[in-house]
Amino acid sequence: WKEGRPNKPGLLLIGPPGVGKTTVARAVAADMEWQVIELNASDARNAGAIRKAATHASTHGSLFMTPGTKPPRTLILLDEVDHLSGGLREISADRISSIVSGEDFDDSKALKGDSGGKAELLNLLADTRQPVILACNDEMGLWGRTSSTWRTARDRFSKHLITIRFERASNEALRRIALRVIKEEGFTADPGAIDELVNNNPGDLRALVRDLQVMCSLIDSNLTREMVKENIETGVRDTSVEIFPGLDLLYRSRTAQNAMKASRSLD
């Protein structure tokens, strides 16, 4: 994008949860000094919503450009695109335009869920003047796992996308990261404690960091294997923890009794 629009303007990041796909996308945007417009599974991602994101990305640069310079780029980031439902049937251009502009709004004609989202995403990739990154766990969800035309969908998307596959972090990498986090937080840890953390989060860097956040909120100086087992596996703790690490531990509890104990420790 430094030299202009490339032939394939989008990236498709594929990999299991917690390996850093979205983090890498945001880091690229930060390094390139791009703004970010993000749509994830919790947002409406129908044809109108995707068209709005594309329109906003195009106008944002022209609004904030310095005279005599090129307008800044805006990264359009769509996370969890394997959860984008529906086929490739397009919504009429007039209908999308009226939804985007807000003109003649009729709730009965509003697009529901992801209606027309995949087709509009293809249009976005074909016409975009801004970088696009898609992230997913399983590309077959995007192509249409249950559709007999999934190969056609794959080929149509692949014309506009460079695919990058992410792998789960190795145990050795997780150990190095855990030790670094513990050290930078001013604590020490027994080797058995680090092994227990790694074994509880096989290949999942995001989950490891969350567990480390919980552990660092509980220990005074040194982390032991027993402390990890007690708090990660059973959710029992003697002190309160902040709400978000505590909720994560609550959701990971394996029994109702342990979940109740974890909930009582929330700060």
Predicted features by range, described:
Residues 3-39:
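Walker A/P-loop
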Residues 14, 192-205, 231-237:
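A short helix-loop-helix "switch/interaction" segment in the helical subdomain of ASCE P-loop NTPases
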Residues 36-71, 115:
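Short glycine-rich substrate-engagement loop in P-loop NTPases that contacts/grips substrate
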Residues 40-42, 136-137, 144, 161-174:
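Conserved AAA+ ATPase "SRH/arginine-finger" region at the nucleotide-binding site
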Residues 62-113, 126, 138:
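Conserved P-loop NTPase "ATPase switch" module shared by AAA+ and STAND
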Residues 133, 141, 148, 207-267:
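C-terminal alpha-helical interaction modules of replication/initiation AAA+ assemblies
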Residues 140-160:
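Short regulatory helix/loop adjacent to the ATP-binding pocket of P-loop NTPases
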Residues 165-193:
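Conserved small helical "lid"/interfacial subdomain of P-loop NTPases
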